[in-house]
Amino acid sequence: MSNLTCKALAAAAVSLLEERPLDKITVRDITDRCGLTRNTFYYHFQDIYDLLGYI
């Protein structure tokens, strides 16, 4: 697991969580925020809840 990629995804998720509730955040929102693809997200995490566990 690339530490920089995971940190970028985590930072994007935290940033979005400051703006809106979790149920209004999609994987695409997270990947768009940090400039990565959905495939990259799913390479590192199973779903948003897996990412939250990382955070």
Where is each model-derived feature located?
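An amphipathic alpha-helix adjacent to DNA-recognition modules
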Residues: 3-14, 18, 23-27, 35, ...
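The alpha-helix within a helix-turn-helix
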Residues: 31
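Key DNA-contact positions within bacterial/archaeal DNA-binding proteins
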Residues: 39
